[in-house]
Curated annotation (Swiss-Prot):
Protein's UniProt keywords contain Nucleotide-binding: yes
Presence of the UniProt keyword RNA-binding in the record: no
GO biological process: phenylalanyl-tRNA aminoacylation
Reactions catalysed: tRNA(Phe) + L-phenylalanine + ATP = L-phenylalanyl-tRNA(Phe) + AMP + diphosphate + H(+)
UniProt protein name: Phenylalanine--tRNA ligase alpha subunit
Protein species of origin: Rhizobium rhizogenes (strain K84 / ATCC BAA-868)
Subunit structure: Tetramer of two alpha and two beta subunits.
Residues noted as binding Mg(2+) in the record, renumbered to the chain: E260
Gene name tied to this protein: pheS
GO molecular function, one term: tRNA binding
Length: 360
């Protein structure tokens, strides 16, 4: 039995000395191959007596198992080491040196800037941000928001529909961010104070419309929300956003399926020059729509309209960016023109804050 111990010690030393996958494979062949040292011992089992097979045979099998386990473990360790070495050799420095010239630095897209500005304003009022999917069901995009069957927005010429699924249901690219209102009411108990920025999609394209555009809307749900609250919130927003001391607003009766009463909001401005000036002048410009949340919408959100009420408003981010920063054509927002970005973009480190200034 001594020779088995000696052989095991020798083989274990060879396994430990192997430095790569080729050398450990050579050890395996020398020990466990057809003519390997352990394989030759295994061939003697057939000529052993039953008594000898119980002792020496068991020892030979134990040697085989021990050597096999050691080789497999070493092979795995060497393979991992080879992968680590390869990864280290292939390391790429993805960092970039500081660009020496301000002209070479990237710019923040105006839409990203506007979202940050609006988030700063409403965040100071105690609102949080809510988000939802761009691909919506008919229920969340239309039915839950009180759009009746036959409403023009449900037509193919206005909305991007997907092919029906196996259940016959057609999903849509959401036509507004309002479905998030329902999802929030389902998931959260009042009071609710949220803003919902995001992409929306409609079949429209010209200098002031795009098939994909950005909206932001707000929702407040509690037991005492009223029209006076809407007016205060929107006046404070417009003063801060357009960076003027005073704004004059007018609320015109309108119709939206998801609010009752509904209003379109105009802001007084001066349109005599190339850039619209707010807080002065005698002209009027529509900037958003708003209203008290319709009782049917509250019911679809799982709330009792006899206990809760709310108000909501919505506006196009692209449009208010054009108004604030004097951008003439909405289509330029999506053309990826570096020259346009260099002109209208914002410096990356100038994050809008109420105390530091919204538009640096």
């Amino acid at each position: 039995m001594t020779e088995l111990v000696t052989l095991e010690t020798q083989l274990m030393a060879e396994v430990a000395a192997a430095t790569d996958e080729q050398s450990i494979e050579a050890v395996r062949v020398a020990a466990l191959g057809k003519k390997g040292s352990v394989s030759e011992l295994l061939k003697t089992l057939g000529s052993m007596s039953p008594e000898e097979r119980q002792t020496r045979g068991a020892a030979i099998n134990a040697l085989k198992n021990s050597v096999t386990d050691a080789i497999n473990a070493r092979k795995g360790a060497l393979k991992d080491a080879a992968i680590d070495a390869k990864l280290k050799a292939e390391t790429v420095d993805v960092s970039l040196p500081v660009r020496s010239s301000p002209a070479e630095r990237g710019r923040i897209h105006p839409i990203s800037q506007i979202v940050d500005e609006i988030t700063a304003i409403f965040g100071d009022m105690g609102f949080s941000i809510a988000e939802g999917p761009d691909v919506e069901t008919d229920y969340y995009n239309f039915t839950a928001l009180n759009f009746p069957e036959g409403h023009p927005a449900r037509e193919m010429h206005d909305t991007f529909f997907f092919q029906p699924d196996e259940k016959g249901e057609r999903k849509v690219l959401r036509t507004h961010t309002s479905p998030v209102q329902i999802r929030t009411m389902e998931a959260q108990k009042p009071p609710i104070r949220i803003i919902i920025p995001g992409k929306t999609y409609r079949q429209d394209s010209d200098a002031t419309h795009s098939p994909m555009f950005h909206q932001v809307e707000g929702l407040v749900i509690d037991k005492t929300a009223n029209v006076a609250n809407i007016r205060w919130v929107l006046e404070e927003f417009c003063k801060t956003f357009f960076e003027v001391d005073n704004v004059t607003m007018r609320f015109r009766p309108s119709f939206f399926p998801f609010t009752e009463p509904s209003f379109e909001v105009d802001i007084q401005c001066d349109r005599s020059g190339p850039i619209v000036k707010f807080g002065e002048g005698t002209d009027w410009m529509e900037i958003l729509g708003c209203g008290m949340v319709h009782p049917n919408v509250l019911r679809h959100g799982g709330l009792d309209p006899d206990e809760y009420q709310g108000f909501a408003w919505g506006m196009g981010l692209d449009r208010i960016a054009m108004l604030k920063y004097g951008m003439p054509d909405l289509r330029d927002f999506f053309n990826a023109d570096v020259r346009w970005m260099n002109h209208y973009g914002f410096r990356p480190l100038d994050m809008p804050t109420l105390f530091g200034g919204l538009s640096a």
